[in-house]
Amino acid sequence: MLVTIFTPTYNRIHTLPRLFDSLLGQTYKNFEWVVVDDGSTDYSYRMLERFKKIADFPVTIKRVGNGGKMRAVNEGVKLAKGEYFMILDSDDYLDLKAVETIADVSTRLPKHFGGMVFRKVDIALNAIAGAPLPSKKYDSNPIEVFYKLGIGGDKAEVIKTCIMKRYPFPEFDEEKFVPEGYVWN
């Protein structure tokens, strides 16, 4: 199963190497990295082109004018070939078994599940962020998880690509940000 790791980036030349190194070290190699450069002016695009040449996984890079994260996500979804789609911001990085875990968990999910949620590490604190997730599969949505289960904190969401294609983020004139919850709830 192919997983799409998607990164929207804007002037993050200083954080991209750590992210790329975490992708190079993945134990499960059946993934692609799709990057939309949202109009960077700091040579991020040149760095991404160098990464593409040395990567041992497929890399797709698209350069667009600065339109904000959600427009970049919509572009990334259009380019995605994976069954699952994970947004990995340019200042994030993955545990070396992250994609392997995604692939493993996805094989055990009921067909009607639209995705998976994992906890993230707070880099500044060097600790796992937010409250623990339920130990068993839980059929829910982000609002219920937050209000009913009391689980807050930043999470790593992995959504079926077909759902992302069906429900793109809205794009508003003069607005560059739409919270993920607008679509995912």
Across the structure, where does each feature detected by a protein language model lie?
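Short aromatic/hydrophobic "clamp" motif used to bind/position activated sugar donors
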Residues: 85
